[in-house]
């Protein structure tokens, strides 16, 4: 969702609460739970999963390895669920012509730096930089170059923009900010 007027441009950034993250967190949780149940049933010698008899899988070495994969998968799954619940990476970019200030806000991981808030004067913006990495899967990226601060990415690496869409976005933003576009 984006909102734009003559003086203010607000771009809402989607964080980790994406459909693909929910899908992979569920698949990883269920798969690792299955591995852990198979490893546990081979250790106990009982059928915790009725798909096949537990005597077919010896605990050493297959049961140990499956238990290890199950535990590792549960840790990775819990990490994914935590990033989804904390909505890491979400936030907004706000360009305010009236105040002459650019605000960039992102949610991070819990702790001292949970809120990432950057503020710049519009007059310090040197250019909007667009980089296109050629290859089998070309990925355009958009950056804002700030005097004395370097470049700040404005697009995520997992966003699937075509070069044409990225050019359009870069042109609109550069026009709004009244700065040049650099293409690399």
UniProtKB/Swiss-Prot annotation:
<dbReference type="GO" id="GO:0015979">
    <property type="term" value="P:photosynthesis"/>
</dbReference>
<feature type="transmembrane region" description="Helical">
    <location>
        <begin position="22"/>
        <end position="42"/>
    </location>
</feature>
<dbReference type="Pfam" id="PF02392">
    <property type="entry name" value="Ycf4"/>
</dbReference>
<feature type="transmembrane region" description="Helical">
    <location>
        <begin position="57"/>
        <end position="77"/>
    </location>
</feature>
<keyword id="KW-1133">Transmembrane helix</keyword>
<dbReference type="GO" id="GO:0009535">
    <property type="term" value="C:chloroplast thylakoid membrane"/>
</dbReference>
<keyword id="KW-0793">Thylakoid</keyword>
<keyword id="KW-0472">Membrane</keyword>
<keyword id="KW-0602">Photosynthesis</keyword>
<comment type="similarity">
    <text>Belongs to the Ycf4 family.</text>
</comment>
<dbReference type="InterPro" id="IPR003359">
    <property type="entry name" value="PSI_Ycf4_assembly"/>
</dbReference>
<dbReference type="GO" id="GO:0009522">
    <property type="term" value="C:photosystem I"/>
</dbReference>
<keyword id="KW-0934">Plastid</keyword>
<keyword id="KW-0812">Transmembrane</keyword>
<protein>
    <recommendedName>
        <fullName>Photosystem I assembly protein Ycf4</fullName>
    </recommendedName>
</protein>
<keyword id="KW-0150">Chloroplast</keyword>
<comment type="function">
    <text>Seems to be required for the assembly of the photosystem I complex.</text>
</comment>
């Amino acid at each position: 969702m984006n909102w734009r007027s003559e003086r203010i441009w607000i771009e809402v950034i989607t964080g980790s609460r994406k459909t693909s993250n929910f899908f992979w967190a569920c698949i990883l949780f269920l798969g690792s739970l299955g591995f852990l149940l198979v490893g546990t049933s081979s250790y106990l010698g009982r059928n915790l999963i009725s798909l096949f008899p537990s005597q077919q899988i010896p605990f050493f070495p297959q049961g140990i390895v499956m238990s290890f994969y199950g535990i590792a998968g549960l840790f990775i799954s819990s990490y994914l669920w935590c990033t989804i619940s904390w909505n890491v990476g979400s936030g907004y970019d706000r360009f305010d012509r009236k105040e002459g200030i650019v605000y960039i806000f992102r949610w991070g991981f819990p702790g001292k730096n949970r809120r990432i808030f950057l503020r710049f004067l519009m007059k310090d913006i040197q250019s909007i930089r667009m980089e296109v990495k050629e290859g089998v899967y070309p990925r355009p990226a958009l950056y804002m170059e700030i005097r004395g601060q370097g470049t700040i990415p404005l697009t995520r690496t997992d966003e699937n923009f075509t070069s044409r869409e990225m050019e359009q976005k870069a042109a609109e933003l550069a026009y709004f900010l009244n700065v040049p576009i650099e293409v690399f």
